[in-house]
């Protein structure tokens, strides 16, 4: 039934808005196979389905990124996208205003929740990772892609990790990126809609040839510590979030990569 609910939400969205206009890319399985297919199997990127599982069973697909939305926390539990050289071409787009995401049927957080809160509207998929087109760049300013972040965290250690991710995407000929806040435990909230403020943020990267994977778990606080000090196993992030990352990887590869904590395979 969870799969049917996801398909229903996507169909309802398409009936309300133009899928083409809002960049929703949906592949709906044969009705007889709905109970056999997981939400992450519904949309395939190239020949590798890199989407995680969803604890909310509410997943949306845009042209530039996909996300699992948590209405309880008024933000996405994960945002997933592919990052290659072409996505980072030099551009000088004007920054749009932050807006609610029209494809979220329950309505994503109103940007006014952040006003005078002391928190930045922190991107999960950075605008700098979506410079390929103005349309994809603008998508990153929907609040479905935003989480509350301390300014010195957003502009500090988190920004350093985003820049390093771009470096690796170039060095290793592309990456799959999954990122979000850990929406578990006791958290502060802001605004009338009580947007949760994560205590930790995570970022998981895997090379497109599936030979390297790395996970970062970063406390939501200012830090000048080297990025490698935040490296953890993907297994640890799975335990904290309840999310299964890369479930479509061959089991022996998934188990080996997700248990690794060594950062020496990556150029820091």
Regions found by a protein language model. Give the residues of each.
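A boundary/linker detector
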Residues: 2-3, 20
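Sec-dependent N-terminal signal peptides
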Residues: 4-14
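Domain-level detector for secreted/extracellular nuclease and nuclease-toxin modules, and
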Residues: 17-268
